[in-house]
Amino acid sequence: MAYFRRNFYGGRRHYYRRRNAYTRRRYRRVRRRHRGRRFPYFKQGKRRRTRLLHVTDPRYKAHCTITGWVPIAMTRIQLISQPFTVDTLSPFHVYPGGYGYGVFTLEAMYKEHLMKRNRWSRSNAGFDLGRYLGTWLTLVPHPYFSYLFYYDPEYGNTFEFKKLIHPAIMITHPKTILVLSNKRGGNRRKWPRMWIPRPAIFADGWEFQKDLCQHGLFAFGWAWVDLDRPWMADISKPAQTIDPSTYDKKNDMINKVPNMWWKEAANDWLTEWGRPQGSGVTQQFNQLAMAGPFVLKTNKSEYVNTELLQIILFYKSHFQWGGEFLQDKVLADPTKIPPAQTAYYQQAGQTNLYGSPYKPLSSGLHDSISELPIASPPQNPHKYTVRPSDYDKDGILTEESFRRLTDSPYTSDGGHSFSSFSTASDPLEGTSRYARPLGRKTTREPSRRRKRRRRSPSPEDEETAPIPPKSNSEPSISGPGRATRKQLLQRLFRRLLTSSPQ
């Protein structure tokens, strides 16, 4: 193979390789002393072999993608540097802060599904195992303010994680994403998108969904950042804190506290409600004290045109459901499922196979608005699942597992024992879909048919009629239909004795 580079004469050469300008010098071959292997290939007379790790997957597997959105920030511009606070007295105002953090879990995603905030591509019904693969996050920039977003799959204590959510600390971390505002970064740029792998503590094996809900998938934190004034804001009037009683007579440092010109008792009702409210600056002073490098300042700027700041987050998590149940699969009759196109091309007045008018599809793969039914929350696996922990050391089902598997789903009141609704609110109670419970006395309506008259027995009936027993020790016979073999033999023997000649 020819390769081209500049030669000593300049320009590009047009031959395979450069001609040797001098005869190549030949060296004597020197024998090399070989050292032994650092890691012995043979140990104690046996060759080292690679051990294989076998992982058994469940028989049935299904891929599920959970796509949704979640609001992560809703703050006010006046209280960016303060934490989330709520008034303890009326009117109970809510003051959100300028940073936040949270943890993504499978249980939280199920609760978000109940609020119609996410969509599951595959239902978890019929599966008791689960495996987490990872999550895609898409960050939406704010029109006027920039913020920092930080994620950590291997997080520890959430209280210690909260201490590190500061713009001056997060801005130097490699896992921090700087989301510039549209005012600074432009409106045509792409939204930041990142892939968060599963934590290192998660092995490649499967877990029960109930156990998977107890593990946090990843933790995240966010905080507003000020890149225009990272150190301090524009100060118009400095706060006087040396002698408030002399310099600021009507500009008290604490709201609703009167000027202390003389000593008096501290009456709570008088201090809180009896005096007029002054124009205190304690709140503004605390904001300046709590602010630090890169903290968003609350002074008015050219970018501030709204008081309530909001951020949303889009996520797309990947899971796998698996397992095998000792139950039949629920199938649909393919002859009774109309095509998806018929719901859009039917005219008014036409009916389907059942005689009812066509209606738009409410479920199915062709409907982009419908949702798959999530039968049960992931933290409640199916009760009829046979797990490895249900067997003892000899491979036999334990007593508790056998009782759980053989328990009837119907109770004495007619309702399901594993459902939350009662018998009174059950719309299907009393129909043919429910089995008749044990121990309940059912009353039948009197028959309108005319009762048949009893006729006198014929001679043939008298011969075949049962003979009453002679003593109490003999078994009683209620009829020829219920007679056992022993009773029939006794009846035949007694008839032979009565019919024999004297």
Swiss-Prot record:
Entry keywords, A to Z: Capsid protein, T=1 icosahedral capsid protein, Virion
Chief place where the protein resides: virion
Domain of life, source organism: Viruses
Signal peptide, first to last residue: none
Keyword Plastid listed: no
Compositional bias of kind Basic residues: 447-456
One Pfam family in the UniProt entry: TT_ORF1
Gene Ontology CC: one annotated term: T=1 icosahedral viral capsid
Localization: Virion
Keyword Lyase found: no
Region (Disordered): 369-392, 405-487
Family note: Belongs to the anelloviridae capsid protein family.
Functional description taken from the UniProt entry: Self-assembles to form an icosahedral capsid with a T=1 symmetry, about 30 nm in diameter, and consisting of 60 capsid proteins. The capsid encapsulates the genomic DNA. Capsid protein is involved in attachment and entry into the host cell.
Name used for this protein in its record: Capsid protein
